[in-house]
């Protein structure tokens, strides 16, 4: 009888300890789940800051190279450029880095995709029109929507092999490059139009004097 009571108490003790350990384990797991959500929120916030920095730099650069900037006095342009350079300098002081965890295959895919884009960018000065068409096909390869033009199937398979965060960064880089090309095209057309108007004005003036 005494032995039975001792055994029962020992069994009860083991049960209590086991139940207590399970509760602790459950609480710890719940805490880690909550921390994981906060970690992902932190990464998302840092990525958003990183993107905002890129957008700000692009906007400042766009203003400095805008047609409006060419059509003001030298003194005003110098003053505005000083302000733009100051803003750019302050923007560059913000350092944000979100490292992406990659396996060797994803690392290689990212290098391959980056190399392809860099090769297209290097041809901007030689043939901007062809480079833009090539960039459009690369961008279409990254789009989940029905592309308006041809898709670079080889590039698409390479991008699919990249980490998800890298896929988003590749798409953003292509968007930025295409916007810069469009802005350059507009600036060139406006400049040519201004030159053409100036040339006609001079011809009319010459005609009057003749």
Swiss-Prot record:
GO terms for biological process: negative regulation of protein ubiquitination; positive regulation of proteasomal protein catabolic process; positive regulation of protein processing; protein stabilization. Residues 20-60 form a coiled coil. Signal peptide: none annotated. PROSITE patterns: BAG (PS51035). The modification Phosphoserine is found at residues 20, 31, 73. It comes from Mus musculus (Mouse). Keywords: Acetylation, Chaperone, Coiled coil, Phosphoprotein. Residues 109-189 form the BAG domain. One of its GO terms (molecular function) is heat shock protein binding. This is BAG family molecular chaperone regulator 2.
């Amino acid at each position: 009888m005494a032995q039975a009571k001792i055994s029962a108490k020992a069994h009860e003790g083991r049960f209590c300890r086991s139940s207590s350990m399970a509760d602790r384990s459950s609480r710890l797991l719940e805490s880690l789940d909550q921390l994981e959500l906060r970690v992902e929120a932190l990464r998302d916030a840092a990525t958003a800051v990183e993107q905002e920095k890129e957008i700000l730099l692009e906007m400042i650069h766009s203003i400095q190279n805008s047609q409006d900037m060419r059509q003001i006095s030298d003194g005003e342009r110098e003053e505005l450029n000083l302000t733009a350079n100051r803003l750019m300098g302050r923007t560059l002081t913000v350092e944000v880095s979100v490292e992406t965890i990659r396996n060797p295959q994803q690392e290689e895919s990212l290098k391959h995709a980056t190399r392809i884009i860099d090769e297209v960018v290097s041809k901007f000065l030689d043939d901007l029109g062809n480079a833009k068409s090539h960039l459009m096909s690369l961008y279409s390869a990254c789009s989940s929507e029905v592309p308006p033009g041809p898709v670079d199937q080889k590039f698409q398979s390479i991008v699919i092999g990249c980490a998800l965060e890298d896929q988003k960064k590749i798409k953003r880089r292509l968007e930025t490059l295409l916007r810069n090309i469009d802005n350059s095209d507009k600036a060139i057309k406006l400049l040519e139009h201004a030159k053409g108007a100036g040339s006609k004005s001079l011809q009319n003036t010459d005609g009057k004097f003749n």
